Amino acid sequence: MAAERGAGQQQSQEMMEVDRRVESEESGDEEGKKHSSGIVADLSEQSLKDGEERGEEDPEEEHELPVDMETINLDRDAEDVDLNHYRIGKIEGFEVLKKVKTLCLRQNLIKCIENLEELQSLRELDLYDNQIKKIENLEALTELEILDISFNLLRNIEGVDKLTRLKKLFLVNNKISKIENLSNLHQLQMLELGSNRIRAIENIDTLTNLESLFLGKNKITKLQNLDALTNLTVLSMQSNRLTKIEGLQNLVNLRELYLSHNGIEVIEGLENNNKLTMLDIASNRIKKIENISHLTELQEFWMNDNLLESWSDLDELKGARSLETVYLERNPLQKDPQYRRKVMLALPSVRQIDATFVRF
């Protein structure tokens, strides 16, 4: 399973890779808990609590004393075990959980993944917000479908090659610099790598079942190596170092594209993405709405914080009969005293302009 756009889309965006986290659910919002679909976020998102890069150690956590595991009573017959924020410092004593399918250990003091080999029925493992530096000792968990090790201290993607049934992988807000060691995850549908240190999109050619890819808040300079991901419906690349929209020609099923907070100057390269319902190009350097008249299924268009000056550019959106939400604030044309009225006249289907609903 697993980003806010209220007054100001920036807030929304950060929720997405996360919100998307919602979709991805898992990406942001405190990240909420991913397991949804939507709205990754940064979400996402989600809203992602996609936030600051975390230091090697949190001084407060270092002084927090781990709980004595003998004081925790585990139900041997439980299928869902939630030990969120229990101050667990070491994974031990869980071998009695022969029937467990979901194990939540988020927000604890765990430094090492260990002693889980007996939990062979496990489908979901949540280690979000701990102090883990390495992905290891998961080889026996061959039934695992969801793995979340977001908000830890990981530097490498490793130790997941035997998890061939994995469908959702969340590694948000770590210190990962390279996408690697994922080639065996043929069933993966959602991959969340927001808020890391990744510089290139690479080594994902075999992930042909991937539906959602979240790479917001990294250091990526080019959209590339996406040709094999023909099932992708959500792509989030917010807050990177992109200057050009390219490499999307094979993503014919793409429905949501998030490219805000980059250095893009021209809307282009979307000729084959006819199914887009959401296009986020906010906070770039774009002067003109162009090359999107064929996107007739658009429902949301976010282009606030750019350099748009001409009202005639809105004609590019007239073919999108289902367009309901547009964000155009903090563009030069917003200075027009008749700004909202002109948007409504140009795009009569719109029900929300920026953060405000249209009143009739």
Curated annotation (Swiss-Prot):
GO terms for cellular component: chromosome; cytoplasm; extracellular exosome; nucleus. It comes from the Eukaryota. Residues 17-34 have a biased composition (Basic and acidic residues). LRR repeats lie at residues 77-98, 99-120, 121-142, 143-164, 165-186, 187-208, 209-230, 231-252, 253-274, 275-296, 297-318. Residues 53-63 have a biased composition (Acidic residues). InterPro entries: Cilia_flagella_integrity, Leu-rich_rpt, Leu-rich_rpt_4, Leu-rich_rpt_typical-subtyp, LRR_dom_sf, U2A'_phosphoprotein32A_C. Widely expressed. Changing F170A: Severely impaired the binding of protein phosphatase 1. The modification Phosphoserine is found at S12, S24, S27, S44, S47, S322. Residues 331-360 form the LRRCT domain. Keywords: Acetylation, Leucine-rich repeat, Nucleus, Phosphoprotein, Repeat. Residues 1-64 are annotated as: Disordered. Its main location: nucleus. GO terms for molecular function: enzyme regulator activity; protein phosphatase regulator activity. The keyword Heme does not apply. It is found in: Nucleus. It holds the Pfam family LRR_9. The modification N-acetylalanine is found at A2. SMART domains: LRR_SD22 (SM00365), LRR_TYP (SM00369), LRRcap (SM00446). The keyword Nucleus applies. PANTHER family: PROTEIN PHOSPHATASE 1 REGULATORY SUBUNIT 7, PROTEIN PHOSPHATASE 1 REGULATORY SUBUNIT SDS22-RELATED. Belongs to the SDS22 family. Interacts with PPP1CA, PPP1CB and PPP1CC/PPP1G isoform 1. Regulatory subunit of protein phosphatase 1. This is Protein phosphatase 1 regulatory subunit 7.
